[in-house]
Amino acid sequence: MLRWFHALMPKEERFFDLFARHSQAVLAGAQALRAMLEGGAAVERNYQIVMDREHDADDVTREVLIAVRRTFITPFDRGNIRDLITSMDNSIDQMQKTAKGVILFDVTEFTPQMKEMADAIVKCAQLVQQAVPLLNSISSEAVHLSDLTAQISALEGRADELHDIGLRELYHAKSKSDPMGFFVGNEVYDHLEKVVDRFDDVANVMHGIVIEHV
């Protein structure tokens, strides 16, 4: 009877499968957001991909939160699991807000700094995807995990620099001659910076988990 009961309960390993699925959705969303910034027809086409992947990520997040409540033994602290999946979900939620802003303001041209910030977003998503399976072996992969989270934090710092450089150039180019253009560009920069900030949050949660287990 007890064996049958345990068979119905979510398995510890399932969390890592769910984290992996979520990270795949996040990466696909990041790649679609970057493709949007190529402009032209790519904007509308990739906008829908961002929306779809955000919905996929939401579905996985719900599965994780349900599994946390139903699982007797979790791979690490329940609060850490919630924090991790929430931070990952926040990253793609912010991508969705960015994509919506691009559509709302009908933006079809993007600066080199915006594109480089989007490149950083894709790289952050790739690093998260690399880090997720390593959480299944925290003790032996602590150094590798710490390196990946440090790379994400470095990308966040670079994105801040790109934001400031791009915004300064935009101000000199459009603040007087095209105030609306400056406002819209500022919004895009702000959204892109927030996406990278959310990835830095993911890195901080992962780093905290590593510290607790070594």
Predicted regions and their residues:
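Cytosolic, long alpha-helical scaffolding segments
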Residues: 1-214
